[in-house]
């Protein structure tokens, strides 16, 4: 056997080759921390001195956590997912990434969790990139004033508190007053715009469900699917059974998905249902992380929680692509108290509010819109021109009717003018009622409101008002289609158009039969009665 000899030159050459081929970036330094406290959806971690605010941390079982509290010796993290497998002493790794969500057209028609993962069993989602959840809202110079209408399909809202694309309009009221129904109907009302295929008309919708029952979210999805509205809607679901961290993050996830479309020059409608539950979840997380409580035990930055979310809704300037994101945040009140902490915060952030009152709802007035304290601060300039023309006096007339109604309750004798105003008010209240999941096209709303405010329905019995309206609109679409199309196109109505509408209504009245068997304008019973 030959003797093994190693020459010094060979050792030197091998070392030189290794040193020359060494790449410093191939080596990595990883920080590993340790869980010191775990439970109730939060974890405290030691040993990660370089962690960033809002950085994702990875626990031993693969669950992610979000670094919220950066203290001198430890990090307070909220666990994003099931926390039962996280125990003291387990290692925690940094990911080097801040929280982000995948975005893209593939989200339309899907139900996802607050991390953007599909939960509807329809397979993976095709995405076009990722977007950070904590992004700066558009600056003042990036914005443009609101000037395009975002119709809800409700006469009461579109006539008296109009909403424009890029506006933030709060929907506020007690539980079970129709807040979600108003929001869902607004999504359904975008169906005709979507079917035009025109990107300038199409609206992509996002429904963020926070802290609701799973059955409620399923029923909303079913209603949208049945109405043909799911194809342009994304549902971000954080049901009541989810950890508080998911409920806190869900609105930001929906907003990030919507912002991507907005910056691509598209129009977006996002509904947060509801922000009261998000604030409750944030309060729970903050108290568990030992942050100092403030009013109603909410942390000091709860205003910033909602302001940085809602400021992302905007109408972008032409240079930025002219896209828009319209926000409809929902807030629940207790006993119609709009002066509580969260309601006043969100009212001060938004551009107006629709206040739905439980007394009106229980009296059969649906939508239960309280005209007195509902307002739209910027939507007037975006309102459909024909609607603005016919709805000018509607708010004042209804407010006067409510006062007169309260006065008449004392049984005082009223003069003829007051009686006439009271009777017309009763008809207008009846006219503004609408069934759920039946939004009305703009041209139908214009005719209906004009007929009511100008007294064209004064001779129709109150009990027949809704049937009269339904049959009148069917008659107009059948025999006066050109007239309805001209109203829809958005121009202010000329005197000739108004005369044509009045003639058409008079024409219809000749054949309308009231519930007591009379033809309008005649005192004799209809034939066969």
Swiss-Prot record:
Entry keyword rRNA processing: no
A molecular-function term among this protein's GO annotations: ATP binding
Protein name: ATP synthase subunit alpha
Cellular localization per UniProt: Cell membrane
SUPFAM superfamilies in UniProt: C-terminal domain of alpha and beta subunits of F1 ATP synthase, N-terminal domain of alpha and beta subunits of F1 ATP synthase, P-loop containing nucleoside triphosphate hydrolases
A Pfam family the protein falls into: ATP-synt_ab_N
Reaction catalyzed: ATP + H2O + 4 H(+)(in) = ADP + phosphate + 5 H(+)(out)
Subunit architecture: F-type ATPases have 2 components, CF(1) - the catalytic core - and CF(0) - the membrane proton channel. CF(1) has five subunits: alpha(3), beta(3), gamma(1), delta(1), epsilon(1). CF(0) has three main subunits: a(1), b(2) and c(9-12). The alpha and beta chains form an alternating ring which encloses part of the gamma chain. CF(1) is attached to CF(0) by a central stalk formed by the gamma and epsilon chains, while a peripheral stalk is formed by the delta and b chains.
Ligand binding (ATP): 173-180
Membrane topology annotation: Peripheral membrane protein
Keywords: ATP synthesis, ATP-binding, Cell membrane, CF(1), Hydrogen ion transport, Ion transport, Membrane, Nucleotide-binding, Translocase, Transport
Main location: membrane
Record-stated family: Belongs to the ATPase alpha/beta chains family.
EC number(s) on file: 7.1.2.2
GO-annotated cellular components: plasma membrane; proton-transporting ATP synthase complex
Coiled coil: none
């Amino acid at each position: 056997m030959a003797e093994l000899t190693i020459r010094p030159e060979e050792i030197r050459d091998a070392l030189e080759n290794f040193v020359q081929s060494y790449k410093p970036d191939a080596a990595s330094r990883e920080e590993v921390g340790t869980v010191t406290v775990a439970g109730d959806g939060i974890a405290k971690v030691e040993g990660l001195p370089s962690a960033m605010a809002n950085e994702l941390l990875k626990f031993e079982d693969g669950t992610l956590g979000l670094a919220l509290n950066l203290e001198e010796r430890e990090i307070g993290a909220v666990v994003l997912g099931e926390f039962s497998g996280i125990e003291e002493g387990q290692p925690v790794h940094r990911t080097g990434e801040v929280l982000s969500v995948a975005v893209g057209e593939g989200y339309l028609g899907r139900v996802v969790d607050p991390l953007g993962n599909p939960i509807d069993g329809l397979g993976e989602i095709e995405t076009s990139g990722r977007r950070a959840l904590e992004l700066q809202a558009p600056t003042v110079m990036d914005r443009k004033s609101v000037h395009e209408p975002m119709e809800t399909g409700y006469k009461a809202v579109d006539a008296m508190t109009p909403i424009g694309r890029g506006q933030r309009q709060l929907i506020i009221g007690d539980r079970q007053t129709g807040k979600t129904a108003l929001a869902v109907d607004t999504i359904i009302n975008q169906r005709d715009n979507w079917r035009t295929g025109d990107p300038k008309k199409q609206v992509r919708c996002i429904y963020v469900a926070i802290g609701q029952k799973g059955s409620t979210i399923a029923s909303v999805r079913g209603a949208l699917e049945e109405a043909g509205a799911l194809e342009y809607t994304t549902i971000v679901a954080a049901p009541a059974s989810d950890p508080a961290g998911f409920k806190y993050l869900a609105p930001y996830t929906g907003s990030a998905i919507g912002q991507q479309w907005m910056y691509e020059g598209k129009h977006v409608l996002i509904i947060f249902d509801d922000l009261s539950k998000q604030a409750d979840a944030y309060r729970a997380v903050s108290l568990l992380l030992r942050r100092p409580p403030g009013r109603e035990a909410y942390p000091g930055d709860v205003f910033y929680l909602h302001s940085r979310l809602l400021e992302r809704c905007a109408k972008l300037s032409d240079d930025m692509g002219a896209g828009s994101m319209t926000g409809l945040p929902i807030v629940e009140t207790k006993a119609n108290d709009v002066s509580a902490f969260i309601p006043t915060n969100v009212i001060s952030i938004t551009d107006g509010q629709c206040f739905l009152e439980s007394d009106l709802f229980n009296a059969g007035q649906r939508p239960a819109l309280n005209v007195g304290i509902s307002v739209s601060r910027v939507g007037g300039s975006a309102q459909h021109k024909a609607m603005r023309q016919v709805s000018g006096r509607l708010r004042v007339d209804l407010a006067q009717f409510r006062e007169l109604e309260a006065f008449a309750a004392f049984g005082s004798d009223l003069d003829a003018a007051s009686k006439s105003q009271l009777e017309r008010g009763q008809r207008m209240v009846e006219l503004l009622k609408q069934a759920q999941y039946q939004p009305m096209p703009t041209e139908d709303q214009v005719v209906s409101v004009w007929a009511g405010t100008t007294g064209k329905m004064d001779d129709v019995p109150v009990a027949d008002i809704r049937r009269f309206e339904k049959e009148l609109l069917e008659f107009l679409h059948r025999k006066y289609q050109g007239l309805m199309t001209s109203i829809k196109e958005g121009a202010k109505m000329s005197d000739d158009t108004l005369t044509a509408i009045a003639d058409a209504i008079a024409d219809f009245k000749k054949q309308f039969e009231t519930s007591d068997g009379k033809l309008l304008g005649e005192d004799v019973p209809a034939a066969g009665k």
